[in-house]
Amino acid sequence: MRKVMAAKLHGIHVTAADLDYHGSITLDPDHCEKAGLLPLEFVDIWNKNSGARISTYVIFGERYSRCCILNGAAARTCQVGDEIIICSSHYIEAERIADFQPKILTFDKGNHIVETLSYVVERDGTGRYHFDIVNEGGQSLPIPVKAHGR
């Protein structure tokens, strides 16, 4: 089994931090469902402003609120307005990598979804892997992809 990236909210902004809550990150269920994140799923969080890296679990907040709230100890790692990356991972058999297409959502400063991307891995007849980033229209994007919404 290999640990692979399963879903990512890239460039979402922290809307609140609640030190007195007992842990987790509260997210808009609409964002989570579009990316494939489940309630109680463990995620890694990377703060683009400070470089802090933490892990916690997802809880759903109010639908369509565009919330991104760090709770409990996680609240110490992010400030309101910080741009973060939230990433989940799954374990899969290496042979299944070509069947697996994680979703990546990118955001503007108001936490509106700017783009929905997919990571696509294919294996050719010689056994070599090929990686592509594809937008909703099926168009391949250059690698690395520059984040939009800035």
Swiss-Prot record:
This is Aspartate 1-decarboxylase. HAMAP family: PanD. Catalyzes the pyruvoyl-dependent decarboxylation of aspartate to produce beta-alanine. It comes from Beijerinckia indica subsp. indica (strain ATCC 9039 / DSM 1715 / NCIMB 8712). InterPro entries: Asp_de-COase-like_dom_sf, Asp_decarbox. Its EC number is 4.1.1.11. The active site is at 24 (schiff-base intermediate with substrate), 57 (proton donor). One of its GO terms (cellular component) is cytosol. The gene is panD. Heterooctamer of four alpha and four beta subunits. Keywords: Autocatalytic cleavage, Cytoplasm, Decarboxylase, Lyase, Pantothenate biosynthesis, Pyruvate, Schiff base, Zymogen. Belongs to the PanD family. GO terms for biological process: alanine biosynthetic process; pantothenate biosynthetic process. The lineage of its organism: Bacteria, Pseudomonadati, Pseudomonadota, Alphaproteobacteria, Hyphomicrobiales. Binds 1 pyruvoyl group covalently per subunit. Pfam families: Asp_decarbox (PF02261). Is synthesized initially as an inactive proenzyme, which is activated by self-cleavage at a specific serine bond to produce a beta-subunit with a hydroxyl group at its C-terminus and an alpha-subunit with a pyruvoyl group at its N-terminus. It catalyses: L-aspartate + H(+) = beta-alanine + CO2. The modification Pyruvic acid (Ser) is found at residue 24. Pathway: Cofactor biosynthesis; (R)-pantothenate biosynthesis; beta-alanine from L-aspartate: step 1/1. The keyword Transit peptide does not apply. One of its GO terms (molecular function) is aspartate 1-decarboxylase activity. Substrate binds at residues 56, 72-74. It comes from the Bacteria. Its cofactor is pyruvate. The keyword Lyase applies.
